[in-house]
Every structure is written in C-alpha cells, then in structure tokens.
A protein has these predicted regions:
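Short helix-boundary/capping micro-motifs
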Residues: 10-28
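The N-cap/first-turn positions of alpha helices
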Residues: 2-8, 29, 61, 68
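Alpha-helical linker/hinge and terminal dimerization helices associated
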Residues: 42-43, 64-86
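A short LG(V/I)-centered, amphipathic sequence patch enriched
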Residues: 40-57
Length: 117
C-alpha cells in the first residue's frame, strides 16, 4: 500500500463518492477506481460497497481507515518538517569572545574542515 493509495482511500471515505474524491484529488474517476481495486486486491478484502449514489465503507474499510489516517497524519507532519530539517543541514554554530577565543577558534575550525569539508 502506497501513500498515494492511502490518500485516495481516505478521501473516498470522507466523501463517500469516488467521483467527488477524484475531483478533489485532481485525478480521473477511472484512475481512482483502478487504484482502489488494486489496493483491494493487495490487502485481500473489499473497502467499499458500491451503490448507485456513491460508496459505503465496509466494516473492514472503517477499521483500516483508522490506521491509514494515523499514518497519513504522521506522513504529513514529516513532510511539513522537511524544509526545516534541510535548513539546518551542515550548519555549525560557534560562539567565542573575540579577545580570548580567536586563536582557539581558528585551530578548531581547521580541524573541523578536515573532518567536514
């Protein structure tokens, strides 16, 4: 199961409609339906009962949705934190008093640059 499939599944559960979910996800209805069918084959049970006016989540689908929503929340948190992590990449913060630490700083900085070019 991919993150994309989880997002698709969650959105269809939210709207109880493959067409409305497809519209919100900016994918075609046939592509979304195919992805859901692939997911059902992979996990071995039906997620939805198809009806003339949309879909109804099965009992198994409701149980799976709890786990999927938990994973998606963590995934979204991770994605939001990536820019912050990238900003701190390879940054060394150093503080010293100019009158007493200058010589020590340059000696340590030289050693640091040998280890971390």
């Amino acid at each position: 199961m991919t993150i994309t499939q989880m997002q698709y599944f969650s959105m269809v559960c939210q709207f109880q409609s493959i067409s409305k979910a497809a519209e919100q996800l900016f994918v075609s209805q046939p592509a979304l339906s195919a992805s859901l069918l692939d997911l059902e084959k992979e996990i071995g049970f039906r997620l939805f009962e198809r009806r003339s006016r949309g879909v109804v989540t099965t009992e198994e689908g409701r149980l799976l949705l709890q786990h999927v929503d938990s994973v998606l929340k963590r995934y979204n948190l991770l994605m939001r934190s990536l820019p912050e992590l990238a900003e701190h990449q390879n940054i060394l913060h150093v503080g010293f008093r100019p009158t007493s630490g200058e010589n020590e700083f340059f000696s340590l900085f030289k050693k640091y640059r040998q280890v971390q070019p």
